[in-house]
UniProtKB/Swiss-Prot annotation:
Residues 380-439, 454-515, 612-671 form the SH3 domain. GO terms for molecular function: structural constituent of cytoskeleton; vinculin binding. Both isoforms are expressed in different tissues like heart, placenta, brain, skeletal muscle and pancreas. Isoform beta is especially found in liver. One of its GO terms (biological process) is negative regulation of transcription by RNA polymerase II. This is Vinexin. It comes from Homo sapiens. The gene is SORBS3.
Amino acid sequence: MQGPPRSLRAGLSLDDFIPGHLQSHIGSSSRGTRVPVIRNGGSNTLNFQFHDPAPRTVCNGGYTPRRDASQHPDPAWYQTWPGPGSKPSASTKIPASQHTQNWSATWTKDSKRRDKRWVKYEGIGPVDESGMPIAPRSSVDRPRDWYRRMFQQIHRKMPDLQLDWTFEEPPRDPRHLGAQQRPAHRPGPATSSSGRSWDHSEELPRSTFNYRPGAFSTVLQPSNQVLRRREKVDNVWTEESWNQFLQELETGQRPKKPLVDDPGEKPSQPIEVLLERELAELSAELDKDLRAIETRLPSPKSSPAPRRAPEQRPPAGPASAWSSSYPHAPYLGSARSLSPHKMADGGSPFLGRRDFVYPSSTRDPSASNGGGSPARREEKKRKAARLKFDFQAQSPKELTLQKGDIVYIHKEVDKNWLEGEHHGRLGIFPANYVEVLPADEIPKPIKPPTYQVLEYGEAVAQYTFKGDLEVELSFRKGEHICLIRKVNENWYEGRITGTGRQGIFPASYVQVSREPRLRLCDDGPQLPTSPRLTAAARSARHPSSPSALRSPADPIDLGGQTSPRRTGFSFPTQEPRPQTQNLGTPGPALSHSRGPSHPLDLGTSSPNTSQIHWTPYRAMYQYRPQNEDELELREGDRVDVMQQCDDGWFVGVSRRTQKFGTFPGNYVAPV
């Protein structure tokens, strides 16, 4: 009798020698609970082997072994494709006895067994060429190891490369060389699978968990420091850290403490400080290079700077403070809120700062050393200018200057601002506040004239006067007033007898019994003035003193009558002619008809001379007065300005209405 085939002998197991009545219940349970398990890594094809997941039972004192899948024929299993080393079968459905471990199988939908079970992988399941798991986490037996392998592969270090050739680096500028010089030959201490390696001074990728803001690249670090850092990074992930990390992934809760302590040293200073320090170093190096270039170039010959003509500059629109109150006035500035003295008129002495950007110390190399090379600095110091108006600094970069001061120009910041020096102080100031002196003129400051009171006057108040400004003197009817000086035909300066109150007041409110006598003390040359008009002497005091007084109207020759209301001011004529002043007797009710005027700080006004400057202006926009002491302006009106206050308001006379008053300075432009 011919023996069984060799294939059948190879398929026999211990179950074939157990009686059937002892293994019938085991076979039925194994057929219902078999779970396919993927072995051999699961790459390319899926090779199934079935086993019973339940523990084996003991029969007759021995363990009952599992049955192999080849011993249980099942019509629901079909051949899909042959595994390596096997031959495909010609028939579609084959007996179960012919299944081997190298055959792959699929589960058919028409089968009666439709139990849904997860396919379990042994260990971490199949992996790709790099060792990263490709199976889902829920289908593996050891999810913690799967997590560990996945994390290690994501954050693994790139294999070291080894270069078998040598090369020479081109010579570099010593300023741009790093702290670690690169050798010409790169020996590779560690060889990877590709046979290449790099020097430790090269940049090595590290874990993203160890990233510290502000840390520099490892290219600029010594090799021993890089090696120490690599050792720290490799040793930080302990078993406790892994367990905490995996628990966080499974539960979805945040860790109570950091998983890994930062092995690197913490920066002693914030990143902002480090960046500012680097920027300052780069700026200093750039300034040094530019200064070196300037020393090599020949300095141009100095030429006298032309005189500025502020009258030729086009005026700008009114400030935002008035544009918000009067919709009819055009708004040409920015949306930033500004005080009235910050005007955008390039020709007005009260230059606006809305479009000015203060120059940075790194923009121009000459700003750091005060004017570049010594030759160029001497040339710029020869450009002297005299202040035409008082200028009060609004920021630390600006210079506070008085009228008549001499300032030495260092450079021109832009068309509206200059940088110069005054008594050792360096700062910026408006260009149209100064008058550049010719090169042949000796720069000499002009001191304002001083006055000496020879005899005080006396007056008695006929009406009660309440001053609207700080410089005005309020008094009641019947009080005796000591007259200090006569400001003009309409105003006096005096103080209440027996008190310390002092100020200016209208001449029509008092009965003068004796006029004051003054003497002008000139210690220097007079400021250039217009020859058209003559004016009486007036004193000038600092605005911070208690006697800081400024007149809303400087002395001029008047024609016609005047009243306590400061709107009946006559227009100044071209030639002065003496007129007798005919003062009317105002009623007491006139003292209550004065409305609240706009608060003007006349104590900081610029005219500090015995002669007045009449500057013609033309109204560019319409302005409606809000108080009785303000002028009404219409577009095209001619106005003679005699005083320009630091708050942006002008004091002058309208040729159209023949009235005297105040008005915003950026509504007019010089003619």
